[in-house]
Regions:
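Alpha-helix termini
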Residues: 291-299, 374-377
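Domain-scale recognition of functional cores that engage charged ligands
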Residues: 277-282, 308-314, 319
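Domain-level detector for long C-terminal conserved domains
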Residues: 303, 315-515
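Intrinsically disordered, low-complexity glycine/charged-rich regulatory or linker segments
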Residues: 1-296, 472, 477-515
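Short, flexible loop/turn elements at secondary-structure junctions
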Residues: 186, 308-311, 332, 392
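Short, hydrophobic/aromatic alpha-helical segments in well-folded domains
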Residues: 270-271, 287, 304, 313-314, ...
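Glycine- and other small-residue-rich loops at beta-strand/loop junctions that grip anionic moieties
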Residues: 273, 307, 389
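Conserved class I S-adenosyl-L-methionine
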Residues: 299-310
């Protein structure tokens, strides 16, 4: 059933009776639905926790108060390590759990309040918009045993009340109304339901404001779409925030964006789109910083290496944030002139070609190997514990868990283009999970995960919140067995061998052709 709601004009009789005098909730749209109260409440809770579904201006919602006995406040996110940045991101990071976030009282005739929450809406850009606290109320009304046909429906209601006393106090991303109510009515005998959306206006004349009416229609359409999707058996395939909580990642990302984004975009030296690459690398940096905070709490950071580092921006950001490390790529980039740092006499960005010791050497009839410039070769052996970063490293992606096993190093790999261990373009076999798409990217991700597992790694997967469709990150930080028990030669043979890699590496040491 396509979404085609019935518009209800200003003269429509209210469906809801607020017990407070003078508070009139005007219905705007109504639509039939095929899902019951449980689905309605589940969808609404998801929308409360994830307001970014309704508005791209929003990051998330932090739950500050909840009458559910099972709820407990989340720990406050870590504060900035940079005092000069604390003021700029205070609006995002200032979650004071010792404060009392009192909900706005509301009650409706014939309804009982089942659950009351207070959420803080966190905008993407705190320079443009302020966070907003909002009371969210779940209420319900069940038919009595002797109810007539008109009153035989189960009614479920979710109400949003912004903590603002006047329209000008509301940020851009929130409709300028005193309250929003979404009502679900369910006729169990006929298995038919209806949805409707209602506004509590600051001024009843606001019913004529087209933007408010358009927003109401959009909110109802999202609720309808998600509810109907549950009926059709939709299950969420992508799960974010498995490794790092959403609030921590987004707070760190907001901090980095405020600190670096404008300068990086305005002074972009490459021909590629800065709006994509800058925010993508800021997101990856934010994830790594929070990951490392967990992994190395109370320990000295062991350093990182970014293999196939490309333009070097990720290395630059991490160094600026105080992490020791370096990166290399087969081809230097224009950006390196700005991003490179010299520490202890060594460049942070180096032109090197990866040639692992495990790569088979070709045999020639005359007994000679292709000439190598050894000064431009790295054998893939790193100091034990060095964190290996492999971000869209293409030919180096399948080598990442192998090098990590040999060096005793944890890693992150974010695959992009599919290549085999010989460095050639390659279509990996279909994923083991037959419910997943057999796309080239899904095949690559599963194939790389298989290699990692065969190298003895427990593979953790996180769908990064970055502006890229190639956003699957795989982590290796725990092992199923010691590296000595892994037969690397057997792994290489199982996944097609390394034929052609040596010759390609030899050419790269003599040319500027990159990955």
């Amino acid at each position: 059933m396509a979404f085609d709601p019935t518009a209800l004009g200003p003269s429509a009789e209210p469906y809801l009776r607020d017990v407070s005098p003078g508070r009139i909730w005007h219905p705007l749209f109504r639509h039939e639905c095929a899902f019951g109260p449980d689905v309605f409440e589940d969808v609404m809770m998801n929308l409360i926790k994830n307001p970014n579904i309704n508005s791209s201006w929003l990051f998330r919602a932090d739950i500050l108060h909840d009458t559910d006995p099972a709820w407990s406040p989340s720990p406050p996110p870590p504060t900035s390590d940079h005092p000069d940045q604390q003021g700029a991101v205070a609006a995002v990071q200032d979650v004071r759990h010792e404060e009392q976030h009192q909900p706005i009282p509301v009650a409706f005739q014939d309804f009982r309040n089942d659950r009351v929450l207070v959420r803080r809406l966190i905008p993407r850009n705190t320079r443009r918009d302020d966070p907003l606290e909002q009371t969210c109320v779940f209420a319900s009304s069940s038919p009595g045993k002797d109810a007539d046909a008109a009153a035989s429906k189960t009614r479920s209601l979710v109400v949003y009340l912004p903590h603002a006393s006047e329209p000008d106090a509301l940020p851009f991303y929130h409709p300028k109304v005193r309250g929003v109510a979404q009502l679900h009515e369910w006729d169990a005998a006929r298995a038919v339901g209806t949805l409707s959306i209602h506004y509590l206006f600051f001024d009843d004349a606001d019913f004529a404001v087209e933007k408010l009416v358009r927003t109401a229609r959009m909110l109802l359409s999202v609720l309808y779409k998600h509810g109907q999707g549950r009926v059709r058996g939709y299950t969420k395939r992508v799960h974010h925030d498995v490794v790092i909580p959403q609030a921590r990642f987004q707070n760190r990302y907001a901090e980095l964006k405020l600190k670096y984004a404008r300068d990086l975009v305005e002074n972009w030296a490459e021909t590629t789109d800065p709006s994509k690459h800058v925010f993508e690398d800021l997101g990856i940096a934010a994830f790594l910083i929070e990951l490392w905070a967990d992994m190395y709490r109370g320990q000295e950071f062991p350093g990182f290496v970014d293999i196939g580092c490309g333009n070097g921006l990720l290395v630059y950001i991490l160094l600026e944030e105080g992490y020791s490390g370096w990166g290399f790529d087969a081809r230097a980039r224009k950006s390196w002139a700005k991003y490179n740092k010299v520490r202890d006499g060594k460049d942070s960005l180096q032109r090197l070609v990866l040639l692992p010791d495990a790569v088979s050497r070709p045999s020639h009839e005359d007994g000679r190997e292709p000439a190598l410039d050894l000064s431009q070769i790295h054998n893939g052996a790193f100091p034990k514990g060095t964190f290996i970063v492999s971000n869209h490293a293409d030919e180096l992606t399948p080598w990442t868990p192998i090098l990590a096993a040999q060096s005793g190093s944890p890693f992150i790999m974010i695959p992009c283009c599919s290549h085999n261990l010989g460095g050639h373009k390659y279509r990996a076999p279909p994923p083991r999970d037959k419910t997943k798409s057999p796309s080239t990217y899904s095949c690559l991700v599963d194939w790389a995960a298989r290699i990692a597992e065969d190298c003895g790694w427990v593979v953790e997967t996180e769908m990064l919140r970055i502006p890229s469709t190639r956003n699957t990150a795989m982590l290796g930080r725990r092992r199923t067995r010691d590296a000595e028990e892994v037969g690397i030669d057997g792994v290489l043979a199982k996944y097609g061998g390394t034929g052609g890699y040596f010759e390609s590496a030899a050419k790269l040491t003599r040319t500027e052709k990159g990955h």
